[in-house]
Amino acid sequence: MIYQANTLQVKELQDGIAELSFCAPASVNKLDLATLESLDKALDALNAHAGLRGLILTSNKDAFIVGADITEFLGLFAKPEAELDEWLRFANSIFSKLEDLPVPTLSMMRGHALGGGCECVLATDFRIGDKTTSIGLPETKLGIMPGFGGCVRLPRVIGADSAMEIITQGKACRADEALKVGLLDAIVETDQLLESAINTVSLAANEKLDWQLRRKQKTSALSLSKLEAMMSFTMAKGLVAQKAGPHYPAPITSVIAIEEAARSDRDAALDIERKHFVKLAKSEEAKALVGLFLNDQYIKGLAKHAGKSANKATERAAVLGAGIMGGGIAYQSALKGVPVMMKDIAQASLELGMNEASKLLNKRLSRGRLDGFKMAGILSSITPSLHYAGVEQSDVIVEAVVENPKVKAAVLSEVEGLVGEDTVLTSNTSTIPINLLAKSLKRPENFCGMHFFNPVHRMPLVEIIRGEHTSEETINRVVAYAAKMGKSPIVVNDCPGFFVNRVLFPYFGGFSMLLRDGADFTKIDKVMERKFGWPMGPAYLLDVVGLDTAHHAQAVMAQGFPERMGKEGRDAIDALYVAEKYGQKNGSGFYTYSVDKRGRPKKTFSEDILPILADVCQQPQDFDDQTIIQRVMIPMINEVVLCLEEGIIATPQEADMALVYGLGFPPFRGGVFRYLDSVGIGNFVEMAKSYQDLGAMYQVPQLLLDMAAKGESFYDGQQASSL
């Protein structure tokens, strides 16, 4: 043994060829601070080892290295710039030490080599993998950029254009893609990887392969003429700015770093990369996006724990109520390996549900994400039926019939009498209280809400609603089933609107009050989209949701929370509903809709809307961007905080993920609680107080007043780390 540490070891294989194996005791290998320090010492040991002729990097896991340890990021990023720069300089020196070994080096991969894992293999002279190999640099998705030499080495290995595409998109290349661009030198059968690696390094050591030429290319300036460089970088900056937009600086910063470093040798180029990395790491966007990643891991951890705690796994399921929603739920269940019965009283609805599942599978087939054989298997695992025969075999039943409490209660009561005592019943409802539906059941402990969002196959969030009598076993089983379906389940306690709809309607309330006071809805949409970062402004969102749906839900919320969500007189939602302007579904709402060449709805402004709004709005008045944002967002933020205060949702992490996954809250802001931390709770309280005369929706919750007085924040705990 040449060197051994907790997460890696080095030994000689044969004829002076050594193997450095990453072998962390955890389930995956990560380049955390401890592993980097061990790698540095291992390379010193290799440099001192007599008779060394070559080095092969390997991993004892199914994935090579999944990247740096992101749990350390926020703590590191909170350090002063000089300390962060010093940490990066140390990391860079390690990979340069690997690259400068006086012998040929090769990375032998299976599975993922991502982020720091990719940057590690870029420091070696050769790279081979099996067909499971996936190599990429996802850092820009976290609001940062490669900082271990990825922006320096990747362009020199595969060319600037291909490198910028991978880096700016946070893309991972499959083995065949990596081979095509030159990121992999060969794809080898898994059982022949080691033999192939030894042969390649032996050939290089015997000067049959020019490893030194490869190394020189990586450590020199990019071989681009001035004209080529100008065309390449100008085009890349234009495309990236258009795609990423102004709220996500990481992609464009990475292009600028590659451009600035293009004419420098490796060490000078690494200095340039490091400067830009530090700038991004200190940004609020990076803090928010890294925080979201950590929150997502937290949600996955809760789901994993629920699965382990449940006494029974879901092997079969049933969906009651077909159509688009039922078909989407059945598709998602079958796609992830849980056979499902889809029951409806109408043949036409069953056909609609099966057509929805078939359409979604055909899309995957056309994109090469599954083959015809697998598609047929998935489709055959959905059993459409007009009868209940076979429903007793289901472990979990999802009721997805029409949004009517009497109909839902009747269906749930009926099916409860046909299934075993340990079968779990759920209701896919967006507005009907779970405690109300539970009254129709003999075993309410086996019942909870399971609120899917439309379209089911795209929306990652599922709200799991705990009723007054719901058992922990029921929650665990349904959370585990939702996770098995590939969804992000978040448990909330029962209340009108649950969590997502409860916090959405104060947002619509703030919007309606702005309209009442004379604001232009098209300007509000532009400000909320372009300045705050929502995918669509409130008027456009109401059109997509449907003004009829919003009108009904608004009445439910007003009944549940009359002080904050009740209103005097009619508002814009009422006016459009009465005028039968329901939005996209019937071609006219706040905007008018037509179908474009691709068959997608295209919105335009029509003055036909103005007389309808005139009845519920005052004389036109101009509001500045900041006022618009504050008046629309304060009611939502307050309601989110009240949900935490009341225990409707358990943690800031779960709330922020629900907002991003369920409503499209701008990811670069990280969710309401991350946003409050970034602006400062004290600052928010002072700002919100200036609007309190607008009504109860604008009253600051006691929790925020208390935290502001103590100088607290919601995410203090995520900063813990040390250099």
Curated annotation (Swiss-Prot):
Region ranges (3-hydroxyacyl-CoA dehydrogenase): 311-723
Positions of NAD(+) binding: M325, D344, V401, V402, E403, K408, S430, N454
Active site: H451 (for 3-hydroxyacyl-coa dehydrogenase activity)
Molecular function terms from GO: 3-hydroxybutyryl-CoA epimerase activity; delta(3)-delta(2)-enoyl-CoA isomerase activity; enoyl-CoA hydratase activity; long-chain-3-hydroxyacyl-CoA dehydrogenase activity; NAD+ binding
Region: Enoyl-CoA hydratase/isomerase, residue numbers: 1-189
Site-annotated residues for Important for catalytic activity: E119, E139
GO cellular component, one term: fatty acid beta-oxidation multienzyme complex
Catalytically driven reaction(s): a (3S)-3-hydroxyacyl-CoA + NAD(+) = a 3-oxoacyl-CoA + NADH + H(+); a (3S)-3-hydroxyacyl-CoA = a (2E)-enoyl-CoA + H2O; a 4-saturated-(3S)-3-hydroxyacyl-CoA = a (3E)-enoyl-CoA + H2O; (3S)-3-hydroxybutanoyl-CoA = (3R)-3-hydroxybutanoyl-CoA
Pathway it works in: Lipid metabolism; fatty acid beta-oxidation
InterPro entries in the record: 3-OHacyl-CoA_DH_CS (IPR006180), 3-OHacyl-CoA_DH_NAD-bd (IPR006176), 3HC_DH_C (IPR006108), 6-PGluconate_DH-like_C_sf (IPR008927), ClpP/crotonase-like_dom_sf (IPR029045), Enoyl-CoA_hyd/isom_CS (IPR018376), Enoyl-CoA_hydra/iso (IPR001753), FA_oxidation_alpha_subunit (IPR050136)
Superkingdom classification of source: Bacteria
A Pfam entry, by short name: 3HCDH
Keywords: Fatty acid metabolism, Isomerase, Lipid degradation, Lipid metabolism, Lyase, Multifunctional enzyme, NAD, Oxidoreductase
This enzyme's EC code(s): 4.2.1.17, 5.1.2.3, 5.3.3.8, 1.1.1.35
Binding site for substrate: D296, N501, Y661
Subunit structure: Heterotetramer of two alpha chains (FadB) and two beta chains (FadA).
Protein family: In the N-terminal section; belongs to the enoyl-CoA hydratase/isomerase family. In the C-terminal section; belongs to the 3-hydroxyacyl-CoA dehydrogenase family.
HAMAP family reported for this sequence: FadB
Function text: Involved in the aerobic and anaerobic degradation of long-chain fatty acids via beta-oxidation cycle. Catalyzes the formation of 3-oxoacyl-CoA from enoyl-CoA via L-3-hydroxyacyl-CoA. It can also use D-3-hydroxyacyl-CoA and cis-3-enoyl-CoA as substrate.
Protein name listed in UniProt: Fatty acid oxidation complex subunit alpha
Native source organism of the sequence: Vibrio atlanticus (strain LGP32) (Vibrio splendidus (strain Mel32))
Gene that encodes the chain: fadB
